[in-house]
UniProtKB/Swiss-Prot annotation:
This is Large ribosomal subunit protein uL2. SUPFAM superfamilies: Nucleic acid-binding proteins (SSF50249), Translation proteins SH3-like domain (SSF50104). It comes from Shewanella sediminis (strain HAW-EB3). GO terms for cellular component: large ribosomal subunit. Belongs to the universal ribosomal protein uL2 family. HAMAP family: Ribosomal_uL2_B (MF_01320_B). It holds the Pfam family Ribosomal_L2.
Length: 275
């Protein structure tokens, strides 16, 4: 993994910082695990924008990732590591002893040729997936399920991890990167180790066009709009908006709590750290 700072040969190159991983596969992805990925432009089925700042970008295929890791007792080997345009983490193509191939998230330190396994009998080793009841207290894990059999939902981005801090009855307590302490059923599966490609946070795109390649459109300030477009719009000359900051739909944007799922509050032992 190398971090390259480009020379300022032009305005667009001046601030570019690249993260280059020479271990990644340079050919095409495995065709049997690709799916069509359509562009929505941030619009819903009625054609209205429901997510702003989305549109354009390079055409992509979706890589079908195995987030469940339920091929128990069948040894597997990492064939190669690959780039995935759909996520910040890299992915690993895994070949099982029965001939099946699957993509999984590439853990930190994972290399081509590494043996991996899943199930209650799997060794406590980076890349192996086990139920939380079989993982030692204090272990660092990623790709954690929130419901048994549903597939990993927690700690899937590059460089993220979760620590198993306690186990009491049918629940394990996890410490998330945000500082939140949360209970998860002990039958939920997790993969040992951290997610790889932690250097992703060090990259700098350097120019607006690099964002456009990724399908991200510009963000316009509300005070620069007309009153018909935003609550902060309008006014003669430059204004401060005239009210507390809100979204285009009028929802307060700074410190306003929008969580409404009271049903799962009982699983949160401690709220995340306040910044």
């Amino acid at each position: 993994m190398a971090i390259i700072k480009c020379k300022p040969t032009s305005a667009g190159r001046r601030h570019v910082v690249k993260v280059v991983n020479t271990d990644l596969h340079k050919g095409k992805p495995f065709a049997g695990l690709l799916a069509k990925k359509s562009k929505s432009g941030g619009r819903n089925n009625t054609g209205r924008i429901t997510v702003r700042h989305i549109g354009g970008g390079h055409k992509q295929h979706y890589r079908i990732i195995d987030f469940k890791r339920i091929k128990d007792g069948i040894p597997a080997k990492v064939e190669r590591l690959e780039y995935d345009p759909n996520r910040t983490a890299n992915i690993a193509l895994v070949l099982y002893a029965d001939g099946e191939r699957r993509y999984i998230l590439a853990a930190k330190g994972m290399q081509a040729g590494d043996p991996i396994q899943s199930g209650i009998d799997a060794e406590i080793k980076v890349g192996n997936a086990l139920p939380l009841r079989n993982i030692p207290i204090g272990s660092v894990v990623h790709a954690v399920e929130m419901k048994p059999g549903k597939g990993a939902q927690i700690a899937r981005s590059a460089g993220t991890y979760v620590q198993v801090v306690a186990r009491d009855g049918e629940y394990a307590t996890l410490r998330l990167r945000s500082g939140e302490m949360r209970k998860v059923p002990v039958d939920c599966r997790a993969t040992l180790g951290e997610v790889g490609n932690a250097e992703h946070m060090l990259r700098q795109l350097g120019k607006a066009g690099a964002k456009r390649w990724r399908g991200v459109r510009p963000t316009v300030r509300g005070v620069a709009m007309n009153p018909v477009d935003h609550p902060h719009g309008g006014g003669e000359g430059r204004t401060s908006g005239g009210r507390h900051p809100v979204s285009p739909t009028g929802v307060p944007t700074k410190g306003y709590k929008t969580r409404s799922n009271k049903r799962t509050d009982k699983y949160i032992v401690r709220r995340r750290n306040k910044k």
